[in-house]
C-alpha cells in the first residue's frame, strides 16, 4: 500500500466511516430523545458521551497502530472494527428502545415508573451503556485509518485529507442520509445498511493489502450477511416495538422530521398518542384543556378571531369551536402531527359559521411571512406543555409574544402552567412568574384560576377580565355554550381565598427574569422544576449553577489559566501541553458556538429539520474546507515555528468571531425579517460554515507541530482525540447550562475568553523554543 491506487480503498473507508458514524449518531440521538421526553438537556449529555468515548477510541486506534511493527496487523483490524461498530450500534438501539421497561425492574434510586421522566442519573447511565461503546468503536476506526494513511504518505497532506474525508462522510451521513433513511427505513435497518457500507469499505482496504483471493471467504460471508440481515432487522424492529409497548394495542409508530409518534389503545384510556414516549393526546377532551379554553375565551367580550397553538390531541380545537367565533387559526408544534390526528383521532365537527384554518407550518415562520391583516386575533391560547424543551420554550419568549401581539395590541394570552390550589414551591414560582412577567411586559393585567394546573390569562386592563366565578358562569350562559365540567368545578377553582393565596405567592418573586430567544431562562427553570420531581440531586446541581454569575466564572477561569501557565513555564513543558490544550479548547468553543447557532436557527426558522441537518452539514463542510486550506498552508511552511504562528492566527480569529456571533445572529434575523425564508436559512448556513472553517484549519496545523516530536499518524489521532474531548464538555455544558442560563451572548463571551487564553498558552510555547 504505497501508491495512490492502493490508497484509494483507505480513502473510501474514511469517508464510509464518517458516513456511518454520522448516521448512527443521528439515529441514536433520535432514539434517546424518544425515551428522554425530547429534552435538549439529554442531547447535551448524548453528544458529550459520544465525543468523550470517541476521543478515547481515536486515541486507542492511533496508539495500537503505532505499536504495530508493520501495516498488516493494523489493516487487518480495519474490517474487524467496522463489524464491531455495526453490532454495537444495533445493540444500542435495542437497549435504548427497551430502557423504560428495564429501569422499571431496577431498585431505587434507578427505578422508573411507567410514564415517568428519566432523571439525569438515568440519562447518564443509559448514554454510557448505549452511546459510549458505539462512539469508541466508530472513532477507533478513524484513529486506525488516519494512522495507516500517515504511514503510507509522509507530510501534512494525508492528515488534512483524512480530516476532510471524515467531515465529508459525516456530512453525507448526518446531514443528509440520516434524515432520508430514518424516514424511509426503521432505525435498525438504517444502522445496518450504514454499517454494511463501512464494513464493505473495510474489506476493500484489507483486500488491497492481502489480495482479493485471500479475502474471498470473508467477502462471501459479508455478502450473505447483508442479504439475510435486512429482513432480520425488519423483524427485530417489530419485536422490540412490541416489547416496548407491551400492555398496549400498538396501532402505529410514525417518525416525523421532529418526533416519534406512537398511537396505541389501552383499555379504558382509549386511544393514546405518545409523542417522544410521553402521553400527549387522547381520544377525549382532557379536563385541563377544557378549563384552559373556556377560562381564556370568557376573558374577552367578543372573541371572534382565535389563535390556538397546540391542543388538537387534547380537545382544545373542539372546545374553542363551541364558542361563537368567526375564525380559528390552529398551529401544531410539529406540523406532522396534523395528519396523524386526522388519521387516528375523531374528525372535527364541521361548523360553517367558524372558519377553522389548520396551518401545516411553524407558527413563528408564519408570523414573519403572513400579511398584517391575517395576524389579528382577540385571544391566543397556548395549549402546550410548559417549556420543558427549548423547542417548546420558543413559543413562550418575549419575541414570540411580541410578534403575535404586533397587530393585536388588545390580545389576551392564555397559558396552562404548573400549579396547585394549596402549595407553590420555589421552583414552581420561579418558572410561572418568569413566563407571566414576560407575557405581561409590565403593562398587562394577569388573572388566574388555580387548579391542578395554574390557568392564567394576560391582557389589557380594561376592567373586563375577571376572576369571579358567578361572572364567568353568567358569560357562559349568555353565549349559549354548554360546558358541564366547567360549571361543576368553577366555583371551587375561583374560590376567592385560593385566588388571593396564589396571587400572594406569585408576588413573592421580585423582578422575575425575562424569557427571550437568546436567553431562554424559562427552559432552564423548567428543567429544575421537572427534575426536582424525578431526580432531586440533578435538580440541586442545576439550581446551584444558577447561583453562579458569569463574571465570576470568567474571573476564576482566567486566574486558574494564569496559574497553570506559570507552572508550565517553570517546568518548561509548554511544547507538551500547549497545542493539545489549544485543540481541546477549540473543540469546546466550537461545540458551544455550534449549539448556540443551531438553537438560534431553530428559534427563527422553526421545524424545518431537514434544514437543520443541512446546517450541521455546513459545519462539517467548513471543517473539511478548513482542513484542506491548512494543508495548502503547510506546503509552504518550512519551519515548525511558522506552523505555530499560523495556529496562533487561527485562535485569534476564533476568539474575535466568538465575540461577534450574537451580533451576527441578531443582525441576520433583523435584516431577513421582510425577506424570503431561504435568505435567513442561507445566512445561518454561512455562519455555520465559517465556524467550521475556523475550527478545521487548526487540526492539520496542530498535527504538524506535534509531528516534530512523535509519529505523524499518532499525532493526528491524538489531536483528533483532544478535539473530541473538548467538544464533549462543550456539548454537555452548552445544552444544559451555558446557553439557557447565560444566553447566547454570555456563552459567546466565555468562548472568546477561552480562545484568547489559548492564544497566550500557545505563545508561551513559541517563547520557550
Range-by-range predicted roles:
Residues 1-769:
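Alpha-helical transmembrane segments of multi-pass membrane proteins
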Amino acid at each position: 500500500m504505497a501508491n495512490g491506487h492502493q490508497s484509494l480503498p483507505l480513502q473510501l473507508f474514511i469517508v464510509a466511516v464518517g458516513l456511518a458514524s454520522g448516521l448512527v449518531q443521528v439515529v441514536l440521538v433520535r432514539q434517546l430523545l424518544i425515551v428522554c421526553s425530547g429534552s435538549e438537556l439529554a442531547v447535551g449529555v448524548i453528544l458529550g458521551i459520544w465525543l468523550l468515548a470517541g476521543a478515547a477510541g481515536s486515541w486507542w486506534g492511533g496508539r495500537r497502530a503505532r505499536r504495530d511493527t508493520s501495516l498488516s496487523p493494523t489493516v487487518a483490524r480495519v474490517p474487524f472494527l467496522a463489524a464491531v461498530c455495526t453490532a454495537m450500534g444495533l445493540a444500542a438501539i435495542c437497549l435504548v428502545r427497551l430502557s423504560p421497561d428495564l429501569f422499571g425492574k431496577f431498585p431505587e434510586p434507578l427505578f422508573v415508573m411507567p410514564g415517568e421522566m428519566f432523571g439525569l442519573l438515568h440519562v447518564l447511565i443509559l448514554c454510557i451503556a448505549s452511546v459510549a461503546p458505539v462512539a469508541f468503536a466508530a472513532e477507533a476506526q478513524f484513529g486506525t485509518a488516519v494512522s495507516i494513511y500517515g504511514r503510507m504518505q509522509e507530510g501534512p497532506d494525508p492528515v488534512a485529507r483524512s480530516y476532510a474525508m471524515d467531515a465529508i462522510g459525516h456530512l453525507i451521513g448526518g446531514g443528509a442520509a440520516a434524515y432520508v433513511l430514518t424516514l424511509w427505513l426503521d432505525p435498525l435497518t438504517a444502522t445496518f445498511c450504514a454499517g454494511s457500507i463501512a464494513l464493505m469499505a473495510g474489506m476493500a482496504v484489507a483486500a488491497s493489502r492481502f489480495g482479493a483471493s485471500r479475502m474471498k471467504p470473508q467477502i462471501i460471508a459479508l455478502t450473505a450477511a447483508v442479504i439475510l440481515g435486512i429482513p432480520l432487522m425488519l423483524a427485530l424492529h417489530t419485536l422490540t416495538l412490541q416489547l416496548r409497548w407491551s400492555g398496549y394495542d400498538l396501532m402505529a409508530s410514525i417518525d416525523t422530521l421532529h418526533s416519534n409518534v406512537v398511537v396505541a389503545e389501552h383499555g379504558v384510556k382509549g386511544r393514546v398518542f405518545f409523542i417522544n414516549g410521553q402521553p400527549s393526546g387522547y381520544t377525549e377532551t382532557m379536563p385541563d384543556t377544557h378549563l384552559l379554553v373556556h377560562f381564556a375565551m370568557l376573558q374577552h367580550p367578543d372573541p371572534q378571531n382565535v389563535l390556538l397553538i397546540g391542543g388538537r390531541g387534547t380537545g382544545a380545537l373542539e372546545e374553542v369551536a363551541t364558542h361563537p367565533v368567526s375564525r380559528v387559526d390552529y398551529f401544531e408544534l410539529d406540523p406532522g402531527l396534523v395528519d396523524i390526528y386526522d388519521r387516528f383521532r375523531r374528525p372535527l365537527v364541521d361548523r360553517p359559521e367558524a372558519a377553522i384554518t389548520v396551518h401545516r407550518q411553524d407558527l413563528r415562520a408564519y408570523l414573519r411571512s403572513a400579511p398584517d391583516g391575517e395576524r389579528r386575533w382577540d385571544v391566543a391560547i397556548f395549549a402546550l406543555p410548559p417549556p420543558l424543551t427549548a423547542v417548546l420554550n420558543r413559543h413562550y419568549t418575549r419575541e414570540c409574544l411580541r410578534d403575535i401581539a404586533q397587530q393585536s395590541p388588545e390580545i389576551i394570552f392564555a397559558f396552562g402552567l404548573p400549579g396547585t390550589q394549596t402549595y407553590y414551591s420555589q421552583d414552581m414560582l420561579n418558572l410561572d412568574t418568569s413566563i407571566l412577567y414576560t407575557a405581561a411586559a409590565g403593562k398587562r393585567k394577569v388573572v388566574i384560576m388555580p387548579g391542578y394546573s395554574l390557568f392564567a390569562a394576560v391582557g389589557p386592563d380594561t376592567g373586563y377580565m375577571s376572576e369571579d366565578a358567578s361572572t364567568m358562569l353568567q358569560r357562559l350562559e349568555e353565549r349559549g355554550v354548554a360546558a358541564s365540567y366547567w360549571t361543576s368545578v368553577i366555583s371551587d377553582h375561583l374560590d376567592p381565598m385560593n385566588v388571593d393565596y396564589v396571587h400572594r405567592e406569585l408576588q413573592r418573586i421580585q423582578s422575575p427574569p425575562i424569557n427571550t430567544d437568546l436567553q431562554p431562562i424559562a427552559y432552564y427553570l423548567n428543567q429544575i422544576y421537572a427534575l426536582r420531581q424525578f431526580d432531586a440531586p440533578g435538580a440541586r446541581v442545576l439550581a446551584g449553577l444558577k447561583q453562579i454569575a458569569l463574571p465570576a466564572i470568567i474571573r476564576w477561569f482566567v486566574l486558574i489559566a494564569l496559574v497553570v501557565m506559570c507552572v508550565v513555564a517553570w517546568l518548561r513543558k509548554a511544547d507538551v501541553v500547549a497545542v493539545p490544550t489549544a485543540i481541546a479548547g477549540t473543540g469546546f468553543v466550537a461545540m458551544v458556538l455550534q449549539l448556540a447557532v443551531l438553537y438560534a436557527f431553530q428559534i427563527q426558522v422553526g421545524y424545518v429539520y431537514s434544514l437543520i441537518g443541512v446546517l450541521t452539514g455546513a459545519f462539517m463542510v467548513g471543517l473539511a474546507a478548513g482542513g484542506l486550506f491548512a494543508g495548502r498552508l503547510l506546503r509552504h511552511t518550512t519551519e515548525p515555528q511558522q506552523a505555530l504562528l499560523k495556529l496562533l492566527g487561527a485562535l485569534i480569529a476564533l476568539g474575535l468571531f466568538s465575540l461577534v456571533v450574537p451580533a451576527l445572529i441578531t443582525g441576520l434575523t433583523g435584516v431577513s425579517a421582510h425577506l424570503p425564508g431561504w435568505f435567513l436559512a442561507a445566512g445561518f448556513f454561512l455562519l455555520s460554515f465559517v465556524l467550521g472553517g475556523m475550527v478545521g484549519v487548526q487540526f492539520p496545523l496542530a498535527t504538524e507541530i506535534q509531528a516534530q516530536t512523535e509519529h505523524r499518524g499518532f499525532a493526528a489521532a491524538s489531536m483528533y482525540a483532544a478535539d473530541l474531548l473538548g467538544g464533549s464538555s462543550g456539548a454537555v455544558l452548552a445544552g444544559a447550562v451555558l446557553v439557557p442560563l447565560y444566553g447566547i451572548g454570555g456563552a459567546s463571551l466565555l468562548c472568546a475568553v477561552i480562545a484568547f487564553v489559548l492564544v497566550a498558552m500557545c505563545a508561551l510555547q513559541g517563547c520557550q523554543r
